Amino acid sequence: MPLACVYTDLDGTLLGRGSSLFRDAEGGFSLAQARALEACHRVGAEVVIMSGRREPQVHEAARLMGQTSYIYEAGCAFAIDGETTLMTGEMAPNEDGTIYEQIEERGIPKLLFEHFDGRLEYHSPWHHGRVLSHLFRGKVDVEEANALLHERGDDDLRLLDNGAIGRPMPTVEGRTHAYHLVPKQVSKAAAVAGHARARGYDPADCIAVGDSVEDLEVAAAVGRFFVVANGPQNDAGLRGALPAWDNVTVTEGEMGEGFYEAVVSSLMERR
């Protein structure tokens, strides 16, 4: 069957250095991403961004690519042709405020900052303007964080690891990671599955590309998942998680070149 859809992370995957669509991992000019997008357009395969970024950012990125659907805030919601579907379960905006405000009012971010003192902070300035999740950076044990939430009776939330980033912290050794505090039902995998159902796609006719542990879970919702080479290079946790999946390929190329490799190899297999 033809390739129906390509789900892709943005930062560190589709985008090159400096979060540019036209830069490779080293910062050189590259048309690899554009050529891959063109190839998808020629065969009628939809390209859907699955990002931790907030909705206005992802909407604009999708619009610039000519796409009408996208997944944002690490799977908290997806949009198709202007219609939004929340994936946050029982948590929803109400008279007490947005989901972001409800989580803040419960003191969960403060709890995590105190518990992981010096190892976790807001991912400024990108944590502003969010409505469904909180965005942090640092280097923490996600299982420890979620155990802490469970002990406090806040197990309707979870902390997820959205991969290594290039923003260092003076109190953290090595690469920092981006973390999202989200309702427990939220995941990129669930959002991808929800989007595919809404579009009527067979998961076997879809692929996904990413660079983080959270991205890797999307392998359960698609026929094949591609990890761009920079992902496991920068993240020991991702390297350790790879053997658990039998439908995952690590690309030779990094970032956008890896995305190009994933798209072109998938199209050639289906000729």
Residue ranges with predicted function:
Residues 86-106, 160-177, 236-243:
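Charged, glycine/proline-rich intrinsically disordered loops and linkers
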Residues 114-222:
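Conserved acidic, metal-coordinating active-site core of Asp-based
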Residues 14-27, 176-183:
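Glycine-rich phosphate-binding "P-loop"
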Residues 2, 29-30, 182-184, 189-271:
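Mg2+-dependent phosphoryl-transfer enzymes with acidic/Ser/Thr/Gly-rich catalytic loops
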Residues 2-23, 49, 219:
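Asp-based phosphoryl-transfer active-site loop
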Residues 28-125:
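Active-site phosphate-binding/coordination module
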